[in-house]
Curated annotation (Swiss-Prot):
Subcellular location: Cytoplasm
Transmembrane listed as a keyword: no
HAMAP family named in the record: Glu_tRNA_synth_type1 (MF_00022)
Residues annotated for Zn(2+) binding in this entry: C96, C98, C123, H125
Protein name: Glutamate--tRNA ligase
UniProt family annotation: Belongs to the class-I aminoacyl-tRNA synthetase family. Glutamate--tRNA ligase type 1 subfamily.
Lineage start: Bacteria, Pseudomonadati, Pseudomonadota, Alphaproteobacteria, Magnetococcales
Motif 'HIGH' region, residue numbers: 7-17
Species annotation: Magnetococcus marinus (strain ATCC BAA-1437 / JCM 17883 / MC-1)
InterPro entries: aa-tRNA-synth_I_cd-bd, aa-tRNA-synth_I_codon-bd_sub2, aa-tRNA-synth_I_CS, aa_tRNA-synth_I_cd-bd_sf, Glu-tRNA-ligase_bac/mito, Glu/Gln-tRNA-synth, Glu/Gln-tRNA-synth_Ib_cat-dom, GluQ/Sye
Taxonomy, superkingdom: Bacteria
An annotated GO BP: glutamyl-tRNA aminoacylation
Cofactor: Zn(2+)
Purpose: Catalyzes the attachment of glutamate to tRNA(Glu) in a two-step reaction: glutamate is first activated by ATP to form Glu-AMP and then transferred to the acceptor end of tRNA(Glu).
Length: 472
């Protein structure tokens, strides 16, 4: 089996395209086949290298690197042209000299008769073609019968040939059209299975005709349902993030996005959570449903949190480091990253949230969250906090661990009568700037004795000024 993902570099890799790439990847991997990436860049005006790079980056982040490619459609223009000329020589195509005005008049007349606008084939049997007039080359679509194919998702599809007009193969400037290029490339790249969005279904009968006219084997087709927003309309930018790399920037894991996308049209019992290995083992495009899949960002966010909680530090390290560097942390130490991850996994739903929470490990807070200050820095707890800070100064570097810190806290709580919930939150605010942070003993150890005591002293000054200022 050879599948292909064939995006056009006229926009970023969006989630709909990513799901198609994922389905191609899974179907090929499931049977030990091969995936090919073909960049369909024949629209030279709208294609550019930056968008090609963005597509490659998106696929790489998702873990969907192809076995072959990227191959560029524009590299095979001469081959596409040769095949059109071959069909012309064999009488399976013809030169059409119709002017734009003629075509416009033809469509206007058809619309006036309430007919479907289509080319009427008037140049098929033109006896005296003008010698100096520009022309296109059109395919002679069969006039009778129908095209039938067993779609792996949609079931058997029948299209009457009378619904199809004579497809342009070469434009008047000699450039090949999309459908011709796709057929030639699919044949030359030995593609056996074409998995693509159902918006391509209308191209399939035309492409099947070309395969047959050229004497080539027709691949198997699977047209998967499109992604829709929660309002039922086709997914677009107005529904929020649609670019794969934008999801990364917002803190989603590739594993979670893949997991969510595979569930857009496919299921395996009641199971919601899948690893890539599980998807490869279980996925079959024949089991993809026909109805449109609704993209629900809230559900993706929930699933992302599940993947964060179930992943080991080594699985999250690279993504957290990427986000930290974007937030201004230079070259974070991987071993230190592995130590801080477990304390945050249960508290966040995105890797961006984790990176933002982790910033205090690298940079002391320059201000404190107003809600945390108002809630926890009260005059009645100031004496206990001051006593705790004094006690922590007596804890040596060798004792600065869970056991040593816990003993110091317990002594102060016994002496002052303060509860852990009361005395602990000011410590958390001092170290992290917020009352939402990992365990107190953990953050004191990870920030280190010297820096922790410095931050605790800074908060003491702030605390005293706040209390005395309020009383004064």
């Amino acid at each position: 089996m050879r599948t292909r993902f064939a995006p056009s570099p006229t926009g970023f890799l969006h989630v709909g395209g990513a799901r198609t790439a994922l389905f191609c990847h899974l179907q090929a991997r499931h049977v030990g086949g091969t995936t090919v990436l073909r960049i369909e860049d024949t629209d030279r005006e709208r294609s550019n290298q930056a968008l090609v790079d963005a597509i490659l980056d998106g696929l790489h982040w998702l873990g969907l690197d192809p076995d072959e490619g990227p191959l560029f459609q524009s590299d095979h223009t001469q081959r596409h042209t040769d095949m059109a000329l071959k069909l012309l020589e064999e009488g399976k195509a013809y030169k059409c000299y119709c002017t734009k005005q003629e075509l416009d008049d033809m469509r206007a007349a058809q619309q006036a008769r309430k007919e479907k606008p289509r080319y009427d084939g008037r140049c098929r049997h033109r006896s005296e073609p003008p010698s100096d007039q520009p022309y296109v080359i059109r395919f002679k679509t069969p006039l009778e019968g129908e095209v039938v194919w067993p779609d792996m998702v949609q079931g058997t599809i029948h299209i009457a040939n009378k619904e199809l007009d004579d497809l342009i193969l070469l434009r008047s400037d000699g450039s090949p059209t999309y459908n011709l290029a796709v057929v030639v490339d699919d044949h030359d790249m030995e593609i056996t299975h074409v998995i693509r969005g159902e918006d391509h279904t209308s191209n399939t009968p035309r492409q099947i005709h070309l395969f047959q006219a050229l004497g080539w084997d027709v691949p198997s087709y699977a047209h998967i349902p499109l992604l829709h927003g929660e309002d039922g309309s086709k997914l677009s930018k107005r529904h929020g993030a649609v670019s794969v790399l934008q999801f990364r920037e917002e803190g989603f894991l590739a594993s979670a996005l893949n997991n969510y996308l595979v569930r857009m049209g496919w299921s395996h019992g009641e199971k919601e959570e899948f690893t890539m290995d599980e998807m490869v083992a279980l996925f079959d495009v024949n089991n993809v449903g026909r109805s449109a899949a609704i993209f629900n960002t809230s559900k993706l966010l929930w699933l992302n949190g599940v993947h964060i909680r179930q992943s080991g530090p080594e699985q999250l390290r690279g993504e957290l480091m990427w986000h930290l560097q974007r937030l201004g942390v230079d070259n974070p130490n991987p071993n230190f990253i592995d130590q801080i991850i477990p304390g945050m996994q249960e508290r966040v739903k995105t890797m961006l949230e984790m990176a933002q929470m982790a910033m205090f490990y690298f940079k002391a807070p320059t201000e404190y969250a107003e809600t945390a200050v108002a809630k926890h820095l009260h005059a009645d707890i100031l004496p206990a906090y001051a006593a705790l800070l004094e006690k922590l100064h007596t804890v040596t570097a060798d004792e600065w661990d869970n056991g040593g810190l816990e003993r110091a806290f317990k002594v102060v709580m016994a002496e002052t009568g303060a509860k852990m919930g009361k005395i602990g939150q000011p410590v958390r605010i001092a170290i992290s700037g917020s009352d939402i942070a990992p365990g107190i003993y953990d953050i004191l150890q990870l920030v280190g004795r010297h820096e922790s005591l410095r931050r605790l002293e800074v908060l003491l000054s702030f605390f005293q000024q706040r209390v005395h200022g309020a009383n004064g």
